[in-house]
Amino acid sequence: MKKLAYLIALAAILCQLIGCASVPAASDDGILIVTTVFPPYDFVREITDGADNVTVLQLLKPGMESHTFDPTPADILAVQNCDLFIYTGGESDQWVTTLLDASPGAEERSVRMVDLVDAVTEDHIDGATHRHDHDHEDDEDEHDHDAPDSDHLEYDEHVWTDPHNAMIITEALCGMICSLDEDSAMLYRDNTDAYLEKLSALDDTLHSLTEQASYRTLVFGDRFPMRYLCDAYGLGYRAAFPGCAAESEPSAATMIYLIEKVREEQIPAILTIEMSNRKIAQAIADETGAQILGMHSCHNRTTDEAATDKTYLDLMYENAAVLKIALGVTE
């Protein structure tokens, strides 16, 4: 937090010395919307398609992880000068609170996506390696994990992996953008209606897949950012780590548990997430013969995905193709 306070002060000094011309800024003639991660950036692009007076800026550059992101002075200036700032509101956005507290008026122009939907806290996943497993190897009662202290509850950030949440967020953002630019409200609403139809079609696709599933449990040899998707379509899940935990080495007990789970249920695929080194999944696959497949949390695009301008819908349909194999759908 000391580093962030320094950057906020530095941003203020730079703005005074050289002005803010190099940073997109809100003005009477245009609207600047800033997001931390990719999904709301893409939603806003869909809502404002065809509007020449809207600039959308995503702070997280392609290939970067949101959980290790540190804002630059230019990022701070963009947040302080924008008309609307959209962030997730989970653990990886802790820096946002400090920035908003130090930026008069910024909080009123900001929205947390976890406040727009029924967000859940990171779950205790059977067999997964939790922080407690490293910090308290000999702790006695596993039930303590099921009721964590309220001071340590962490939202599962990946709310957009459920298309229903994507629809709710898109509708809410449309309303906010319409209030910023009433003259173009009809355009924004028409765009939103068209996009909601596409999201509904994605939902139909996922429902169809899960209804035909031969297997109903997904095993992630990795972190687990797909809680909302699994809950939405009634899928069970096991993973090496909950949410996007900071841990990178699973316990021996976790590895044994996942290997036995795959063998017992004859699960055909071990799943990983984007930007993973796949080491854990490979170790499980070596023991079970299951294939390794990758799913995408959509929190950010890789440099290649950004270069081809893949959308949220593109990435989610790729996830659907992976699910077809992982769930044993034959049609």
Question: What positions do the PLM features span?
Answer:
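Sec-dependent N-terminal signal peptides of Gram-positive bacterial secreted proteins and lipoproteins
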Residues: L4-V23
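Extracytoplasmic metal-acquisition and chelation regions
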Residues: C20-E331
